[in-house]
């Protein structure tokens, strides 16, 4: 079911999310469906969006959903960085559509997680995907891209047209 995306300023976006527990697994299929439906609706509306974090729809759990060529579910992910190489880029967010933020991200990352079937997984990420998962992972810790702006002049407004 499509859920409301929490917007910049909502206090829930700044909370640290709890682990998905054994008792939570019964709710996981519904949560994943809600994340999927919400992401697809955002794509239809704005023509963009590749991933969403559970806290963005009010679920304070360590759960990420990404849809590229197929769906990816990351339960209780852990993100690490194999080296210190970083780069700057313009970042946006479903929680503040139209606002762009210049941030610094690691060029490479490794994410370890459980999938939607409780199987362990690991992905090495580089460039665009590394940045995407760092952005979504930050949501689990109550960190927004606006908090990672490289300086106080790194916020830009961008008008997005609604796809009709």
Regions found by a protein language model. Name each.
Residues 1-164:
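Positively charged
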């Amino acid at each position: 079911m499509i859920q409301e995306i929490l917007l910049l300023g909502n206090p829930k976006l700044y909370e640290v999310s709890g682990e998905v527990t054994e008792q939570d697994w019964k709710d996981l299929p519904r949560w994943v469906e809600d994340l999927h439906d919400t992401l697809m609706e955002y794509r239809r509306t704005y023509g963009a969006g590749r991933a969403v974090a559970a806290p963005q729809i009010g679920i304070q759990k360590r759960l990420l959903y990404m849809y590229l060529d197929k769906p990816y579910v990351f339960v209780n992910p852990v993100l690490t960085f194999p080296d210190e190489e970083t780069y700057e880029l313009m970042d946006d967010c479903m929680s503040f559509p139209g606002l762009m933020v210049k941030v610094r991200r690691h060029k490479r990352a490794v994410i370890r997680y459980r999938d939607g079937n409780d199987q362990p997984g690991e992905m090495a990420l580089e460039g665009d995907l590394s940045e995407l998962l760092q952005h979504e992972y930050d949501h689990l810790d109550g960190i927004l891209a606006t908090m990672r702006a490289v300086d106080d002049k790194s916020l830009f407004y961008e008008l997005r047209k609604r796809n009709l």
